[in-house]
Amino acid sequence: MDVKWDSMTFDEMEEVKRNVFFTTLEQLKGWARSNSLWPLTFGLACCAIEMMAVGGAHYDLDRFGSFFRASPRQSDVMIVSGTVTKKMAPLLRRLYDQMPEPKWVIAMGSCATAGGPYVKSYSVVKGVDQIVPVDVYIPGCPPNPAALIYGIHKLKEKIRLEAKTGKKVL
């Protein structure tokens, strides 16, 4: 059906603006991806307890479209929470490599972001970003569940912005 835009009244134009969405396929895919994140949990220390609380009834991450997955092949977000040791680093990288594209990483807590209180230990990695690229950092020792939900929302915003601009957002 062809629409003659010049013959429409102002009220009809306003009705079209309210009810018709104009977008690109990339933006639509970005919206769908951002609203159906499936995180792979990688809990290594006390931050993992806070991450488990997000999946509980009080916070209920499922209502945001995120479902925790146990397999990296079914996940598109890796949430690293806790102290990453040099012995654990190759396993973390292998799990990241097994995730399908597009994939994102959230570093949760002081240990995952910068080594935490164990930063001077010989066996601790000084931030998970030395192993895998990190998209969102969540500070705290441990961060509360609301901070993790906020970090997931920031990741959703980043995914939508990347889909809209077509460029990688730092």
Swiss-Prot record:
**What does the note accompanying the cofactor annotation read?**
Binds 1 [4Fe-4S] cluster.
> What Gene3D superfamilies does its record include?
3.40.50.12280
The residues listed in the UniProt record as binding [4Fe-4S] cluster, with positions renumbered to this chain, are: 46-47, 111, 141
* Example of a GO biological process term: electron transport coupled proton transport
Q: What is its EC number?
A: 7.1.1.-
Extract the GO molecular function terms from the UniProt entry: 4 iron, 4 sulfur cluster binding; iron ion binding; NADH dehydrogenase (ubiquinone) activity; NADH:ubiquinone reductase (non-electrogenic) activity; quinone binding
**InterPro entries per UniProt:** NADH_UbQ_OxRdtase-like_20kDa (IPR006137), NADH_UQ_OxRdtase_20Kd_su (IPR006138)
According to the UniProt record, one GO cellular component term is: plasma membrane
| Cofactor entry | [4Fe-4S] cluster
Q: What is the protein's major site of localization?
A: membrane
Subcellular location(s) of the protein: Cell membrane
Give the record's subunit note: NDH-1 is composed of 14 different subunits. Subunits NuoB, C, D, E, F, and G constitute the peripheral sector of the complex.
Annotated function: NDH-1 shuttles electrons from NADH, via FMN and iron-sulfur (Fe-S) centers, to quinones in the respiratory chain. The immediate electron acceptor for the enzyme in this species is believed to be a menaquinone. Couples the redox reaction to proton translocation (for every two electrons transferred, four hydrogen ions are translocated across the cytoplasmic membrane), and thus conserves the redox energy in a proton gradient.
Family matches, as PANTHER family? NADH DEHYDROGENASE (PTHR11995), NADH DEHYDROGENASE [UBIQUINONE] IRON-SULFUR PROTEIN 7, MITOCHONDRIAL (PTHR11995:SF14)
Q: What is this protein called?
A: NADH-quinone oxidoreductase subunit B
Originating species: Geobacillus thermodenitrificans (strain NG80-2)
